[in-house]
Amino acid sequence: MILRGVCMLLFALSASATQPVDMDEVACALCHFEEGDDFSQSVHYQRGLILCNDCHGGLPFEADDVVAKAEGTGFIGRPSREQIAGLCARCHTASEIHFTSGPHGNWRLMDNPTCITCHHNHYVLDASPVLLQSKCTLCHDAGSDELQRWDRIVETLDRQRQRVVAVQTRLDTLAPEARALRRALPLVEFAHGALREAETGTHGLDTALIAAKVEESEQELRKAEQSMTDYFADLRQRKWIAAILWLFVVINVALLWVRRK
Protein backbone atom coordinates (compact mmCIF):
# COMPACT_ATOMS: atom_id res chain seq x y z
CA MET A 1 0.00 0.00 0.00
CA ILE A 2 2.85 2.40 0.83
CA LEU A 3 4.50 1.74 -2.53
CA ARG A 4 1.21 2.33 -4.34
CA GLY A 5 0.83 5.59 -2.44
CA VAL A 6 4.31 6.71 -3.51
CA CYS A 7 3.49 5.97 -7.16
CA MET A 8 0.26 7.97 -6.91
CA LEU A 9 2.13 10.86 -5.26
CA LEU A 10 4.78 10.91 -7.99
CA PHE A 11 2.03 10.99 -10.62
CA ALA A 12 0.26 13.81 -8.79
CA LEU A 13 3.46 15.83 -8.52
CA SER A 14 4.23 15.44 -12.23
CA ALA A 15 0.66 16.38 -13.12
CA SER A 16 0.74 19.46 -10.86
CA ALA A 17 3.82 20.99 -12.51
CA THR A 18 2.88 24.08 -14.53
CA GLN A 19 4.43 26.10 -17.29
CA PRO A 20 7.13 28.42 -15.92
CA VAL A 21 6.55 32.15 -15.78
CA ASP A 22 8.53 34.47 -18.03
CA MET A 23 11.77 35.31 -16.22
CA ASP A 24 11.52 38.84 -17.63
CA GLU A 25 8.56 39.29 -15.29
CA VAL A 26 10.55 38.25 -12.22
CA ALA A 27 11.83 41.43 -10.60
CA CYS A 28 14.56 39.60 -8.64
CA ALA A 29 16.38 38.81 -11.90
CA LEU A 30 16.71 42.51 -12.78
CA CYS A 31 19.53 42.78 -10.23
CA HIS A 32 20.44 39.15 -9.70
CA PHE A 33 20.69 38.44 -13.42
CA GLU A 34 23.43 35.79 -13.19
CA GLU A 35 21.40 33.86 -10.64
CA GLY A 36 18.35 34.36 -12.85
CA ASP A 37 20.18 32.93 -15.87
CA ASP A 38 21.28 29.90 -13.86
CA PHE A 39 17.81 29.41 -12.41
CA SER A 40 16.15 29.61 -15.85
CA GLN A 41 18.15 26.50 -16.87
CA SER A 42 17.25 24.53 -13.76
CA VAL A 43 14.68 21.75 -13.49
CA HIS A 44 12.94 23.78 -10.78
CA TYR A 45 12.17 26.59 -13.22
CA GLN A 46 11.66 24.63 -16.43
CA ARG A 47 9.06 22.41 -14.77
CA GLY A 48 7.30 25.37 -13.22
CA LEU A 49 7.89 24.10 -9.69
CA ILE A 50 9.23 27.04 -7.69
CA LEU A 51 10.34 30.67 -7.90
CA CYS A 52 12.80 32.84 -5.96
CA ASN A 53 10.40 33.42 -3.05
CA ASP A 54 10.06 29.69 -2.33
CA CYS A 55 13.62 29.64 -0.98
CA HIS A 56 14.39 33.30 -0.29
CA GLY A 57 10.97 34.67 0.64
CA GLY A 58 9.90 38.12 -0.49
CA LEU A 59 7.76 39.20 -3.44
CA PRO A 60 9.37 38.09 -6.73
CA PHE A 61 7.20 40.28 -8.99
CA GLU A 62 7.58 43.49 -6.97
CA ALA A 63 9.96 45.94 -8.66
CA ASP A 64 10.42 48.05 -5.50
CA ASP A 65 13.03 46.10 -3.56
CA VAL A 66 12.04 47.73 -0.27
CA VAL A 67 8.48 46.53 -0.67
CA ALA A 68 9.65 43.15 -1.99
CA LYS A 69 11.73 42.55 1.16
CA ALA A 70 9.41 44.21 3.66
CA GLU A 71 8.45 42.64 6.96
CA GLY A 72 5.67 40.14 6.48
CA THR A 73 6.90 38.96 3.08
CA GLY A 74 8.94 36.15 4.63
CA PHE A 75 12.15 37.50 3.11
CA ILE A 76 15.25 35.73 4.47
CA GLY A 77 17.80 36.57 1.77
CA ARG A 78 20.59 34.02 1.54
CA PRO A 79 19.68 30.91 3.58
CA SER A 80 22.19 29.85 6.21
CA ARG A 81 23.68 26.36 6.36
CA GLU A 82 21.23 25.40 9.08
CA GLN A 83 18.26 26.54 6.96
CA ILE A 84 19.14 24.86 3.67
CA ALA A 85 18.02 21.30 4.39
CA GLY A 86 14.78 22.55 5.94
CA LEU A 87 13.99 24.66 2.88
CA CYS A 88 14.62 21.77 0.51
CA ALA A 89 12.55 19.52 2.77
CA ARG A 90 9.42 21.53 1.99
CA CYS A 91 9.28 19.50 -1.22
CA HIS A 92 11.93 16.81 -0.73
CA THR A 93 10.90 15.51 2.68
CA ALA A 94 12.13 11.93 2.27
CA SER A 95 15.48 13.08 0.89
CA GLU A 96 15.96 15.42 3.86
CA ILE A 97 15.15 12.66 6.35
CA HIS A 98 17.71 10.33 4.78
CA PHE A 99 20.30 13.10 4.48
CA THR A 100 20.07 14.29 8.08
CA SER A 101 20.34 10.71 9.37
CA GLY A 102 23.31 9.91 7.13
CA PRO A 103 27.05 10.53 7.51
CA HIS A 104 26.78 14.06 6.07
CA GLY A 105 23.76 15.10 8.11
CA ASN A 106 25.44 17.33 10.71
CA TRP A 107 25.39 20.77 9.06
CA ARG A 108 27.45 22.20 11.94
CA LEU A 109 30.53 20.41 10.59
CA MET A 110 31.77 22.81 7.94
CA ASP A 111 33.46 19.98 6.02
CA ASN A 112 30.10 18.29 5.52
CA PRO A 113 28.17 19.08 2.34
CA THR A 114 24.69 20.56 2.26
CA CYS A 115 22.01 20.00 -0.38
CA ILE A 116 23.43 22.72 -2.63
CA THR A 117 26.94 21.25 -2.52
CA CYS A 118 25.80 18.39 -4.74
CA HIS A 119 22.70 19.81 -6.41
CA HIS A 120 23.74 23.49 -6.75
CA ASN A 121 21.50 26.30 -5.57
CA HIS A 122 20.08 28.04 -8.64
CA TYR A 123 21.36 25.83 -11.47
CA VAL A 124 19.67 22.69 -10.14
CA LEU A 125 19.84 19.67 -12.46
CA ASP A 126 18.41 16.19 -12.23
CA ALA A 127 20.77 14.25 -10.01
CA SER A 128 22.98 11.71 -11.77
CA PRO A 129 25.87 9.49 -10.63
CA VAL A 130 28.28 11.41 -12.86
CA LEU A 131 27.17 14.75 -11.41
CA LEU A 132 27.48 13.54 -7.82
CA GLN A 133 30.74 11.65 -8.39
CA SER A 134 32.49 14.91 -9.22
CA LYS A 135 31.32 16.30 -5.87
CA CYS A 136 32.41 13.26 -3.84
CA THR A 137 36.00 13.59 -5.01
CA LEU A 138 36.19 17.11 -3.56
CA CYS A 139 36.51 15.51 -0.12
CA HIS A 140 37.17 11.81 -0.69
CA ASP A 141 40.27 10.36 -2.34
CA ALA A 142 39.96 8.04 -5.31
CA GLY A 143 39.95 4.44 -4.10
CA SER A 144 38.81 5.38 -0.60
CA ASP A 145 36.27 3.22 1.22
CA GLU A 146 33.68 5.98 0.87
CA LEU A 147 34.03 6.19 -2.91
CA GLN A 148 34.06 2.42 -3.26
CA ARG A 149 30.79 2.27 -1.33
CA TRP A 150 29.32 4.94 -3.60
CA ASP A 151 30.50 3.05 -6.69
CA ARG A 152 28.71 -0.09 -5.46
CA ILE A 153 25.54 1.91 -4.88
CA VAL A 154 25.71 3.42 -8.37
CA GLU A 155 26.33 0.02 -9.96
CA THR A 156 23.39 -1.53 -8.10
CA LEU A 157 21.00 1.26 -9.08
CA ASP A 158 22.17 1.35 -12.70
CA ARG A 159 21.70 -2.39 -13.05
CA GLN A 160 18.18 -2.24 -11.61
CA ARG A 161 17.30 0.79 -13.72
CA GLN A 162 18.24 -1.16 -16.84
CA ARG A 163 16.09 -4.06 -15.64
CA VAL A 164 13.08 -1.79 -15.19
CA VAL A 165 13.54 -0.27 -18.66
CA ALA A 166 13.94 -3.70 -20.29
CA VAL A 167 10.80 -5.17 -18.72
CA GLN A 168 8.84 -1.97 -19.35
CA THR A 169 9.86 -1.94 -23.03
CA ARG A 170 8.93 -5.57 -23.55
CA LEU A 171 5.60 -5.16 -21.78
CA ASP A 172 4.76 -1.95 -23.64
CA THR A 173 5.33 -3.81 -26.91
CA LEU A 174 3.09 -6.74 -25.98
CA ALA A 175 0.34 -5.14 -23.89
CA PRO A 176 -1.52 -3.35 -26.74
CA GLU A 177 -2.07 -6.70 -28.47
CA ALA A 178 -2.57 -8.78 -25.32
CA ARG A 179 -5.24 -7.48 -22.99
CA ALA A 180 -4.31 -10.03 -20.33
CA LEU A 181 -0.87 -8.46 -19.99
CA ARG A 182 -2.23 -5.00 -19.22
CA ARG A 183 -2.73 -6.14 -15.65
CA ALA A 184 1.05 -6.48 -15.39
CA LEU A 185 1.68 -2.82 -16.23
CA PRO A 186 1.12 -1.60 -12.63
CA LEU A 187 3.73 -4.11 -11.45
CA VAL A 188 6.39 -2.26 -13.46
CA GLU A 189 5.13 1.03 -12.03
CA PHE A 190 5.52 -0.38 -8.53
CA ALA A 191 9.02 -1.59 -9.46
CA HIS A 192 9.88 1.90 -10.64
CA GLY A 193 8.45 3.38 -7.44
CA ALA A 194 10.60 1.10 -5.27
CA LEU A 195 13.64 2.06 -7.33
CA ARG A 196 12.86 5.73 -6.76
CA GLU A 197 12.77 5.07 -3.03
CA ALA A 198 16.16 3.38 -3.32
CA GLU A 199 17.51 6.43 -5.16
CA THR A 200 16.16 8.68 -2.42
CA GLY A 201 18.04 6.52 0.09
CA THR A 202 21.32 7.59 -1.52
CA HIS A 203 21.04 10.88 0.38
CA GLY A 204 21.88 8.98 3.56
CA LEU A 205 24.12 6.41 1.84
CA ASP A 206 21.96 3.76 3.52
CA THR A 207 23.15 0.64 1.72
CA ALA A 208 20.75 -1.64 3.64
CA LEU A 209 17.71 0.43 2.64
CA ILE A 210 18.91 0.71 -0.95
CA ALA A 211 19.43 -3.06 -1.19
CA ALA A 212 15.98 -3.72 0.31
CA LYS A 213 14.23 -1.35 -2.10
CA VAL A 214 16.12 -2.72 -5.10
CA GLU A 215 15.04 -6.23 -4.07
CA GLU A 216 11.46 -4.98 -3.73
CA SER A 217 11.70 -3.54 -7.23
CA GLU A 218 13.13 -6.81 -8.53
CA GLN A 219 10.29 -8.83 -7.01
CA GLU A 220 7.72 -6.69 -8.83
CA LEU A 221 9.62 -7.15 -12.10
CA ARG A 222 9.69 -10.91 -11.60
CA LYS A 223 5.92 -10.87 -11.16
CA ALA A 224 5.58 -8.94 -14.41
CA GLU A 225 7.92 -11.36 -16.19
CA GLN A 226 5.96 -14.30 -14.79
CA SER A 227 2.79 -12.76 -16.21
CA MET A 228 4.42 -12.68 -19.64
CA THR A 229 5.68 -16.25 -19.24
CA ASP A 230 2.19 -17.43 -18.24
CA TYR A 231 0.67 -15.54 -21.15
CA PHE A 232 2.91 -17.22 -23.73
CA ALA A 233 2.42 -20.64 -22.09
CA ASP A 234 -1.34 -20.14 -22.30
CA LEU A 235 -1.00 -18.97 -25.89
CA ARG A 236 0.96 -22.09 -26.85
CA GLN A 237 -1.60 -24.28 -25.08
CA ARG A 238 -4.43 -22.63 -26.97
CA LYS A 239 -2.63 -23.17 -30.25
CA TRP A 240 -2.23 -26.89 -29.45
CA ILE A 241 -5.88 -27.16 -28.48
CA ALA A 242 -6.90 -25.38 -31.70
CA ALA A 243 -4.66 -27.68 -33.73
CA ILE A 244 -6.14 -30.78 -32.07
CA LEU A 245 -9.68 -29.54 -32.70
CA TRP A 246 -8.91 -28.88 -36.34
CA LEU A 247 -7.32 -32.32 -36.63
CA PHE A 248 -10.44 -33.84 -35.06
CA VAL A 249 -12.64 -31.99 -37.56
CA VAL A 250 -10.49 -33.07 -40.51
CA ILE A 251 -10.54 -36.72 -39.38
CA ASN A 252 -14.31 -36.68 -38.96
CA VAL A 253 -14.83 -35.07 -42.34
CA ALA A 254 -12.56 -37.67 -43.90
CA LEU A 255 -14.46 -40.52 -42.18
CA LEU A 256 -17.79 -39.14 -43.39
CA TRP A 257 -16.44 -38.90 -46.90
CA VAL A 258 -15.17 -42.51 -46.77
CA ARG A 259 -18.51 -43.79 -45.46
CA ARG A 260 -20.45 -42.03 -48.20
CA LYS A 261 -18.32 -43.75 -50.82
At which residue positions do the language-model features occur?
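Alpha-helical transmembrane anchor segments
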Residues: 259-261
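Sec-dependent signal peptide recognition
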Residues: 1-9
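Short sequence/structural segments immediately N-terminal
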Residues: 16-257
